[in-house]
Amino acid sequence: MASRVFQFSLLIFVAMIFGAHGVSAAEPMAPPDIRTTFFTGQPFTATSPSGTKFTMIFTPDGKMTREPIEQSGTKSAGTWKLNAKGFCTAWGHAAANCFTVVPSGENKWSVQRTATTIATTVAVWSK
């Protein structure tokens, strides 16, 4: 009986070790990969945490637009640039905010604010 308890305990321990290492969070995309995936002038969809959907267009020359797909949300334009970890945007005359892009499923990416040590998802991009 003690042998079976030991074997069961060992099995649980091994499962925990391999399970902890087998599941890892996706790494943020490298800035050049963000550029070639999204900043090409081709439209893609962004969904805010509240569910508002926008058609986004980031052009290679550093300009961007967003247009609401539904009636909620406002159309706006701004500029973008790559940084060491991801990219930064400035909408209209607002101050710049910086983000990373993390793959989150097939043809889906989480856009996360990088201003703090805790990642905050501000949109989900899809193609």
Model-derived features with residue positions:
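Lipid interaction determinants
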Residues: 2, 7, 19-77, 81-127
